[in-house]
C-alpha cells in the first residue's frame, strides 16, 4: 500500500479521527472495527488493507498525537520526564488517556508505544552507563506511568517540578549521562 497516495492518507486520517472521537466516548476495549468503519464510511476490507487490527490503528493515532522523537532532548527526557511529557503529547491525547485510564487494552498499547518512542529517542545516543537501552526505556516508561497512577490512586495533585524531583531522588539519573 502506497502511503503517499492521497486516497490512502485520507482513509487513514478519517479512521484515526473516528477512533479518536470514539475513545473520548467509550473504552477502547468496547470499540469495534465494524463500528469504526460504519462511522468513517470505510469498508471493513479497506480497513484491513491498512491496519492489522484496531490496536494497530490506535498505534497510528499515538504517532499522530505525539511530537517526533528527534525533537526531544534525551538529557531532558531522563532528568525531567514530567516536564517533557507535555511537549511530547498533542491534544487530544491527554484527554483520551484520562478517559481510557481504566481500559487495560488501551493502556497496554499506550505503554508499548511509549517504550518504542523512548527506544527511538535513544537510538543514536551513547550512554556512559552499561544499562541496556531496552531496559532503560522499559524502566523509564513504566516508572513514569507509575507516578501518574500513584497520583490518581491516592488522589494527589503533584506539580511537574516536584514529580521530577521525586523521580531524580528515586533513580540515579546521574549514572545515565549521555556521552558527548
Regions picked out by a protein language model, each given a short descriptive name:
Residues 1-26:
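Basic, helix-initiating cap at the start of DNA-binding domains
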Residues 2, 24-26, 39, 128, ...:
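Cytosolic nucleotide-binding catalytic cores of signal-transduction proteins
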Residues 2-3, 23-28, 41-59:
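HTH DNA-binding helix-turn interface
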Residues 15, 34-39, 47:
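Append "Primarily bacterial transcriptional regulators
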Residues 32-33, 62-74:
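Short, basic, alpha-helical segments at the C-terminal edge of helix-turn-helix-like DNA-binding modules
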Residues 71-102:
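Hydrophobic alpha-helical connector segments
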Residues 102-148, 172-175:
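Amphipathic alpha-helical packing segments from all-alpha helical-bundle domains
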Residues 153-180:
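C-terminal peripheral helix-coil segments that are non-catalytic and often amphipathic
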